[in-house]
Structures are given as structure tokens and as C-alpha cells.
């Protein structure tokens, strides 16, 4: 579970900061939720949770529901947020985010 790696308090604060539509910023979210300071293995575990179909990639539909992995009551990302997040993470242009791309995104 996310709370095995991240504190419930940090998750709540990070989610509160992006409640409004189009207010999501991956850099500030990763920082607030405490992901930035985690080890490579811990970030891989989080990636595994986000990769809901276990394909080895986070696809656009999974990215849209990104916040709901942290709390079931969180909102879905807007189309604009999802596209911006994907564009930032998908460095090889294949339309999805792999584990190495996710690591780079978290540390950005």
C-alpha cells in the first residue's frame, strides 16, 4: 500500500493542494507527498501500484486516475493535466511511462 512507503499525513496534504481542477503539478505533488526523497526501490514499488494492469507501463487511462491511487475519494486528473503529465514523463514518445521514465520524473 502507498502508506507502507508514504505517510498518510503527507498524502493528505499533497491531495489537498491539488483539489481544484487543473491545479495538479507533478513536481510539487511528488515533493509534498514525500516521494522525492525515497529510494529507487521505494519509487519502483509506487510505480507498481500506479501500473494497475501490471503491463510494466503507466498508460494514459491509469495516469488520469493517478490521484485515486493515493486516496479513493480523490478526483481524476483533467484531460489537460493528464496530457501535460504524460508529456513530462514520456521521454521516448511511446505514449506511456515506463519505470525508468517514472524514476526520472520523480527526481526531476
UniProtKB/Swiss-Prot annotation:
CDD domains cross-referenced by the UniProt entry: EFh_parvalbumin_beta
Gene3D superfamilies, per the entry: EF-hand
Binding site for Ca(2+) 1: 51, 53, 55, 57, 59, 62
GO molecular function: calcium ion binding
Cross-referenced InterPro entries: EF-hand-dom_pair, EF_Hand_1_Ca_BS, EF_hand_dom, Parvalbumin
Every EF-hand domain range: 38-73, 77-108
SMART domains, per database record: EFh
Record-linked Pfam families: EF-hand_7
Ligand binding (Ca(2+) 2): 90, 92, 94, 96, 101
Annotated PROSITE patterns: EF_HAND_1, EF_HAND_2
Signal peptide start-end: none
A GO term from the CC aspect: cytoplasm
Keywords: Calcium, Metal-binding, Muscle protein, Repeat
Protein role: In muscle, parvalbumin is thought to be involved in relaxation after contraction. It binds two calcium ions.
Xref: PANTHER family: PARVALBUMIN ALPHA, PARVALBUMIN, THYMIC
Protein family per UniProt: Belongs to the parvalbumin family.
The protein's name in its UniProt record: Parvalbumin beta
Organism: Graptemys geographica
Lineage, broadest ranks: Eukaryota, Metazoa, Chordata, Craniata, Vertebrata
